[in-house]
Regions:
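N-terminal auxiliary segments of SAM/dcSAM-dependent transferases
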Residues: 2-88
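A generic alpha-helix signature
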Residues: 11, 15, 19, 36, ...
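Alpha-helical elements of Rossmann-like donor-binding domains used by nucleotide-donor carbohydrate transfer enzymes
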Residues: 23, 43, 70-73, 113, ...
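Solvent-exposed, non-membrane alpha-helical residues enriched in polar/charged side chains
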Residues: 25, 76, 112, 116-119, ...
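Generic structural signal for secondary-structure transition and capping sites
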Residues: 53, 80-84, 123, 228, ...
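SAM-dependent Rossmann-like transferase core, predominantly class I methyltransferases
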Residues: 58-63, 69-149, 155-168, 182, ...
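S-adenosylmethionine
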Residues: 147-152, 156-304
Length: 305
């Protein structure tokens, strides 16, 4: 690791955990009551030490010179606006440790909730076929596989770069039997690569792009300057395009089996419209509009009759 100039100001008085923690927080420009900066500090210390907070205390962890250099570099990058997950090259999703970088969107807690709700609908221990549309880093597909290793899981995405990251994550986690396919869901024949299967899927789940492009100007630079725009934004004129295409495919193309579940993550302003889209189609039942932990309408689930 290349050393960098350590900026002006004091370095930690010593290499003890308490001193290093306070020093990182100060370099980030935070204060002890700043929850976000405390969280970023904890993530940096977790990464540089290879230990969680409790383990650092129990093991009386001390920072060596290499750790201090790494922390200094990370602080500089974070203050320039880079997401902490990209800086560390890792994130946690549904208890699964994932490699993450600018090839794919950073997984969010709301998406964990979608996985949890869909898993709750599965009462059989038999193998299911599961399709993740817009898989990105593979977070949903891999989280599902971690909970139901007997299932056959396929992740599709329009991005070569995202799929390469998903494959790497699958290998790292020992889930090399997952299927990863390059598919642009908005193409006229979006599932040519995967619709050759003899039967449909038992679960179709998707966290598609859903932010209208007009909202870009009000979003944080940490998001819009670093995360892939293609995974974030849709046109203002047709914000439900992915939902319409996927729901139609589940019915008209037989992607979803009878009794199978469809699960969407949605923009809170359009969740009701997605619910209405499915409610207008008599082939669906048990349609549910679910709120996230902040109380915002965020997920729509439905079962095919």
């Amino acid at each position: 690791m290349n050393k960098i100039e350590r900026e002006k100001g004091p370095w930690p008085a010593n290499n003890l955990l308490s001193s290093v923690q306070a020093w990182v927080l100060e370099r980030l420009g935070g204060h002890p009551e700043d929850r976000e900066m405390r969280s970023v500090t904890r993530m940096m210390l977790d990464a540089v030490s290879g230990l969680d907070r409790g383990q650092r205390i129990v093991n009386d962890w001390k920072a060596n010179e290499s750790a201090l250099d790494a922390l200094a570099q990370w602080c500089v990058r974070f203050k320039k606006g880079e997401p902490i997950q990209y800086i560390l090259g890792a994130t946690s999703f549904f208890g699964v440790s994932l490699k993450i970088d600018a090839r794919a969107l950073i997984p969010r807690p709301e998406t964990e909730e979608l996985i949890r709700h869909l898993l709750d609908q599965q009462s059989t221990s038999e193998s299911l076929r599961v399709l993740d549309v817009g898989t990105g880093s593979g977070c949903m597909a891999l989280a599902w596989k971690s909970q139901r290793p007997q299932d056959e899981v396929t992740g599709v995405d329009a991005s070569h770069e995202a799929l390469s990251l998903a494959r790497e994550n699958g290998v790292d986690l020992g889930f090399e039997d997952l299927n990863w396919e390059l598919v642009d869901v908005l193409n006229p024949s979006p599932f040519d690569a995967v619709s050759k299967a003899k039967k449909g899927w038992d679960v179709v789940m998707s966290n598609p792009p859903y932010i209208p492009i007009s909202e870009r100007q009000s979003m944080e630079n940490r998001v819009i300057l670093h995360e892939p725009s293609s995974a974030l934004f849709v046109s203002d004129q047709d914000p439900l395009s992915f939902y319409v295409t996927i729901a139609s495919g589940c019915l008209k193309e037989g992607w979803l089996t009878a009794g199978g579940w469809l699960g969407f993550e949605c923009h809170e302003e359009f969740a009701s419209a997605v619910e209405a889209l499915l409610s207008d189609q008599p082939e669906w039942r048990a349609i549910r509009l679910l709120k996230d932990l902040q109380g915002a309408p965020r997920m729509v689930l439905a079962q095919k009759k």
